[in-house]
Regions:
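Ligand-site clamp/hinge motif
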Residues: 5-7, 12, 355-400
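Detector for C-terminal structural segments
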Residues: 17-172, 183-191, 343
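Alpha-helical secondary-structure segments
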Residues: 101-119, 165, 247-254, 288-294, ...
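A bilobed periplasmic-binding-protein/Venus flytrap-type ligand-binding module shared by bacterial periplasmic
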Residues: 129-130, 199-200, 235, 351-355, ...
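N-terminal lobe/hinge region of extracytoplasmic solute-binding protein
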Residues: 167-222, 332
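Gly/Pro-rich hinge or "lid" segments in bacterial periplasmic/extracellular proteins
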Residues: 183, 187-190, 194, 198-204, ...
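Aromatic- and charge-enriched surface segment that lines or borders ligand/interaction sites
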Residues: 215-265, 292, 381
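Surface-exposed binding/hinge segments that line
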Residues: 231-233, 267-317
Length: 430
């Protein structure tokens, strides 16, 4: 015996999510799915200001611990720290990686960040994600992306487009796109909102990032100081689901809100590449159709960020109502669908939004997202034909399902990893 008492607890997902955010745990089996196609998204979540930093690096008592060293002089930077805090070393390292335009140096510094994380002993990678789901053979036009988001707007059910019933998860924690930090919430938000860019499939079925509310996704202009400026023109006639005009200023408000220290969003750091982050973002609406944003430096995955929920627009007068995103009657969005029903812990109903700029290419008229985390219940409804997609199956049924449903049992690639994490502020030794 080592004299340690261990209490094991299996929590419902949203409870587990908030327990980890609050640091109210000692050890947890965790997972992370990429937010865009670049390794930095597995590293920047551990900076001290990140809301996704469940290990609590640089938070609480750990904020003042001086135990870390950093030397970036081999990469042409005037940074050398001995016995510094997490913020003085790891946070500085991540910032340097994000501003680095030399690919070799950038990857070398990412290896340093990985080594720093592993040396703490607080993160133990287990295995990589695969996205397992069941999709009925009658469904056509469905696609998912490497981040795990599911898309139904192009679907038909053996040619019928009236409605589709699916189950991707239980009750979402939050559907405010600035505050969401879960894959199921991102799937819902990606149907309800439209950013400057979106994930789509080409004619040959390949995934791609394409313009959504923006007319196009132009190249940035490199300024003399190394910053990069992008100018986006919105499509004509953009509207919110309640019929009001959508303006460039709505994007500016949404981005500044999402990045602000006042909101304290988990994904606020996703705007770190924008000049003036966090409280003075260099983004402006020069007129109702034009958005100008300046980045600190070139960012290879910038277009992917524009398709990420944190970059979706919200309207200032709508979000002034604190409970706006918890009820269909107050939920205002600008995407392919509008919310027309939310029976909490039962079902969320999305109906085609005729105000969406590309509504003529939205095939499915209604999507019912049934809410459950009971995998046996999910499988029963799939077998009965009631739910045409379920995003999880009972582990003990996998071998059987592979055999009995060879075309409907899907194992898709996903950019993510499972790991065990320790709360760095917990003293676990007796």
């Amino acid at each position: 015996s080592v004299g340690i008492t261990m209490n094991l607890e299996n929590q419902e997902w949203n409870t587990f999510l908030n327990t980890r955010k609050a640091g109210d745990y000692s050890v947890a089996r965790n997972g992370w799915v990429a937010d865009y196609n670049d390794p930095i998204c597995f590293l920047d979540m551990w900076i001290s200001s990140s809301g996704n930093n469940d290990v609590q690096f640089g938070k609480g008592d750990h904020a003042t611990v001086k135990a870390y060293s950093l030397d970036l002089t081999p990469y042409g930077l005037d940074t050398k720290v001995e016995n510094g805090t997490w913020a003085e070393t790891y946070d500085v390292l991540i910032s340097a990686i994000k501003s680095c335009t030399d690919n070799d140096n950038r990857y070398a510094m990412m290896h340093i960040a990985e080594d720093m994380l592993m040396d703490t002993g607080c993160i133990v990678p287990l295995y990589f994600y695969t996205d397992i789901y069941m999709l009925d053979d009658s469904v056509h036009g469905f696609f998912s992306n490497p981040l795990g988001y599911k898309y139904f707007y192009k679907c038909d059910v053996d040619g019928k487009t009236d409605s589709i019933n699916v189950c991707i998860a239980s009750e979402p924690d939050v559907l405010d796109p600035a505050l969401n930090s879960a894959v199921d919430g991102a799937t819902l938000d990606s149907h309800l909102f439209a950013g400057l860019a979106k994930w789509d499939t080409s004619a040959d079925g390949k995934l791609e990032i394409v313009a959504d509310c923006a007319e196009s996704l132009p190249e940035g202009v490199v300024n003399e100081d190394g910053t990069v400026t992008y100018t986006y023109t919105l499509r004509d006639g953009l509207k919110w689901s309640d019929g009001q005009d959508l303006k460039a200023s709505d994007f500016v408000f949404a981005w500044k809100r999402a990045a602000s220290e006042e909101l304290g969003a988990d994904y606020g750091y996703m705007f770190e590449n924008v000049k003036g982050y966090p409280n003075d973002l260099a983004v402006e609406a020069t007129d109702d159709k034009t958005i100008v944003v300046t980045l600190n430096n070139a960012v290879a995955y910038w277009d992917e960020l524009l398709a990420f929920p944190a970059y979706f627009p919200v309207r200032e007068d709508v979000v002034a109502n604190e409970g706006w995103c918890t009820d269909a009657s107050t939920f205002v969005s600008n995407g392919a669908y509008k919310m027309t029903g939310w029976d909490h812990n039962s079902v969320i109903t999305l109906t085609k939004n005729d105000h969406y700029w590309d509504a003529e290419n939205v095939t499915m008229k209604e999507i019912k997202f049934y809410l459950s985390d009971d995998t046996n219940n999910m499988l029963t409804n799939f077998k009965n034909g009631d739910w045409l997609l379920i995003d999880e199956v009972p582990t003990n049924e996998i071998a059987t399902l592979k055999t009995e449903y060879p075309t409907e049992f899907v194992v898709a690639g996903q950019i993510g990893t499972y790991y065990v994490c320790w709360n760095i502020n917990e003293n676990l030794l007796p």
